[in-house]
Amino acid sequence: MIQVYINGQYWGHYNLREKINKYFIAQYEGVTDEKDIDSIDILARTGTDRFTQNGSNEDWLELADFCKKNDLNDPENLQYVTDRLDVDSLFTHAAYEIILGNVDFTNVRVYRVPGGKWKYLLFDVEACWRNLDKTPLEYYIKPVTAKIQGFRHE
């Protein structure tokens, strides 16, 4: 968070961060070929809205469909998913969201470089630590939140 003053006049506070786009991801992942940079898939979800920021969402939709239709307790099915999704990225993302107590957890970004796995990006964490009267994990495992998150809830 940065406090901005211009000519002595307060203009508010701003978040200093890089723009999440194909160039940011290319630099982070070491992608240098322009064709590969243009082929980076970046998907976004804000609340219930989903959109493709760059590239295509076809592979992601196929993966999501596979997860819905198949038993992931089957080792072959689970392997299919882990071949396409960087599970460490998912777990790290979930851990950060929970530890930071982010109540705006439905604003999500995932990306994939050509030939790579889908990875989660930590994004939009301005709503962290707003519910200091509750532990973050308490918030995430309550039934309503679990349903919103898309976790299996019975």
What spans do the regions from the language model cover?
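Catalytic-core segments of enzymes that bind and process phosphorylated/nucleotide-bearing substrates
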Residues: M1-E154
